[in-house]
Design a protein with these regions (language model features):
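N-terminal targeting/leader regions
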Residues: 1-26, 30-38, 47
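C-terminal helix-cap and adjacent tail motif
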Residues: 2-3, 13-19, 88-100, 193-227
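Short, surface-exposed beta-edge/turn micro-motifs
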Residues: 50-51, 123-126, 194-195
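Short loop-to-beta-strand entry elements in the cores of soluble alpha/beta enzymes
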Residues: 46-57, 174
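Solvent-exposed alpha-helices and their adjacent loops that cap or buttress functional pockets
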Residues: 45-48, 118-121, 188-190, 212-213
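Small-aliphatic-rich amphipathic alpha-helix that forms the alpha element of a beta-alpha
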Residues: 35-40, 125-185
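Glycine/small-residue-rich phosphate/adenosyl-binding loop
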Residues: 55-148
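A generic local secondary-structure boundary/capping motif
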Residues: 114-118, 159, 184-188, 210
Length: 227
């Protein structure tokens, strides 16, 4: 049942939810399917539904996923930050942020991600968005834009639909660092590749606010970039 009907509220308050997920309340399969059915109206490349989804609810499966997720955290965050690897420090370390407010915000983000890593198996439903498109050879150019542009719109639409019904979620893309292990756990066909994990749970409150963002004049130019 929809609990938020105002589209502007849904668009401005759909957050990456980790700490405020209610792990104790079951999530009905019907609601998950309803939200995904709505999200299927998202745009896609060449009007071909190359997306596939796997919803995980069984404890044994979630425990396997949790082990992979924790290893990804160790390999991509915990160890690189401890060893002060420059690329990771520049991207994630709160200390390199320009002001105290940004530093505090980054500390909260890292803390909330770690909370989800430590509790992922408690999430009622863990959804995986996958693609059957050929994997692009380059991160930019080639078919990369079409590859990700054909899966992220449905993933975001799915999150919006969840939010409108009182559920929280987050795009946990880092887990595909171990895409092969995930594919084995989920028994994906050879032509199907995991793109992102989306943990799903009811939220402990509906009271989410718009996040602070840069002024539009810092990110928008008309006709060409003039700075």
């Amino acid at each position: 049942m929809k609990v938020i009907s105002d589209i502007d509220e849904v668009l401005t308050t759909t957050r990456a939810v980790r700490r405020r997920l209610n792990f104790e309340r079951p999530v009905e399969r019907e609601i998950v399917e309803e939200c995904l059915r709505l999200a299927q109206q998202a745009t896609m490349g060449s009007n071909i539904e190359d997306w596939r989804f796997v919803a995980v609810t069984e404890v044994a499966q979630k425990e396997k996923i949790a082990a992979v997720y924790r290893d990804v955290w160790d390999q991509t965050v915990e160890i690189p930050l401890r060893e002060r690897r420059p690329d990771t420090v520049t991207r994630l370390d709160p200390g390199v942020r320009g002001d105290e407010a940004s530093q505090a915000r980054q500390k909260r983000v890292l803390s909330s991600v770690k909370y989800l890593v430590d509790n992922i198996e408690r999430t009622p439903v863990i959804m995986f968005a996958c693609s059957t498109k050929p994997v692009p050879k380059a991160a930019l150019g080639d078919r990369a834009s079409g590859y990700y542009g054909s899966i992220m719109p449905i993933a975001w639409s799915f999150m919006l639909a969840l939010r409108s019904r009182g559920l929280g979620s987050v795009l946990a893309t880092a887990i595909v660092y171990h895409a092969e292990k995930l594919s084995e756990i989920l028994k994906l066909p050879a032509d199907t590749h995991p793109i992102t994990m989306i943990p799903i749970a009811y939220t402990d409150t509906l009271d989410f606010k718009p996040a602070p963002r840069r002024p539009l004049n810092e990110i928008l130019r008309w006709e060409q970039w003039t700075d």
